[in-house]
Each structure stands twice: as structure tokens, then as C-alpha cells.
Amino acid sequence: QKQLHTGFSEDELERLRRYFLELKCSVAGRFLWQLGTATVDRLGLASLQNCAFTVIDSPIVPFTWAMDMLALGAGVGYNLQKKHVDKLPPVREWFKPPTRVNDGGADFIIPDSREGWVRFLAKTLKAAFLSERPEKGTFTYSTQVIRGKGTPIRGFGGVASGPEDLVWGIGKISDILIKRAGRKIRPIDALDIMNIIGHIIVAGNVRRSAQLALGDCDDIEFLLAKRWDLGNIPSWRAMSNNSVACDDPRDLHEYFWHGYEGRGEPLNFSGCV
């Protein structure tokens, strides 16, 4: 009650205790796992969520928030319809990938924490989308304080993956952004960035990284994003289940049905949001 701030009366608490003891009700497994721990004191309800959702309509927070929630174990859904992704500014023409130097003189020494990894992603996205002059379009970083691979992780459990998966992921995200220099990113680019974030978290050896992407029913690139039979599809796209927003099934593009014919993976559809 103190951690969740439920405001139950003593009578309500007693009744709830009785229901638990009589096995008439229960709470989610994540509550059983974490309630009463310092993790909940520090993170609040965020660490107890099974599901989360965001809209990709700004250049930083949707991605960093998704990374944070995935690292906490929540499944994350996200809307990347063109009407939302178009709200992001163009990628700066002077953006360059951050450079790893691994010494105390780096612009950013990545903290050995979930929050530190999220801040590294945020700095990269800020350099790409929001930097105001060329010298701010990149930065140097160090991974020297990140625990080595195989080191036990206290708190959420598991073992550390070391810094290499994070370095790989930020490099891949930077590659995607550089290809769009001077232009806005497309929904397929937003999907790739989210999927790479998911891959980083899976590689981090703590969570499985469940994602659900919601795109436009006429976005050909999105509809073909997981057509493995076409070849040259990035493996990280396996990180998300993909769905399309559509008011009328008759508006669905023919490519939508290919997944049900054994070509690629079948998509679901839902009403527009």
C-alpha cells in the first residue's frame, strides 16, 4: 500500500488479504516479483508495467522512453504512422556518429546503469536532430566504467553484456540517421531505430524486448519490412510484431495479405488512432 499509494481502507486491506490467502485473487507476476523491494521505491510504477505505448512524433523522448521501458521489462507499442513521424525535424547535414575514445577526456562517459545507456541514446539523437552548428553534430564517448561481459547485475538480475552491444546499436542507429542527412526520417527508419533499441536490450541479457509497431496500411516499405523472402532484410526487424491502422479492410494494400499467403509474416490491423 505504501509503495503503490492505493489509499485502501483497513477494511479493504483486510478483505484483500483474505482473498489472497484463500487464493481467490492475485496480482500480476511482476508485482509478486518486485513489490516490497527498493526497486519499486526508486522507480515507482514504471518497473511494474507489463505494457506501454508511445507515439513517434518528436525526435528524442519516444525513443529514449521506449528504451527505458524495455529495459524495465515492459512490452512497448509505438505508432509510427507518417502523420506522426513527419513532425520530426530533418536530420542535421553535419551529424556524424559519436566517436569512442575510452579515456577520461571523452565528452560523455557512459554511466554503468540503465539510465546511462538511455542518456547515450538521447545525446546521439540530439546531435542528429537538434544540434545548431557542426561542432555540436557529434561527440566523443567512453565506455570505460561499464561492467564487463558476464558480471552479475544486482537489482533486476541477470549478467552484464558489456558495452559492445550498446556501441554496435548506437553505430547502426547513427548509420540510419546519416543516410537521411538533410531530410526527415521515414516511418521505416523509425521502425529500424526502435528495433535496434530492442536488440540492444535483448543483447543486454536482462529482457526479451517485446515490441508492437503500428504503421499506415498503405506504407509499402512498412508492409514489406519483414518480407524475409525478399532478402536483404535487417535481422533486427524480428524485434517487433507489426500492425497497420485502417478504418476499412477494403483499403488494405495487397501486400498486407502476402503474409497470410506464406510470404513474410502476417500483420494485424486496427482502427486508426
Predicted regions and their residues:
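Extended catalytic cores of very large enzyme megasubunits
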Residues: Q1-V273
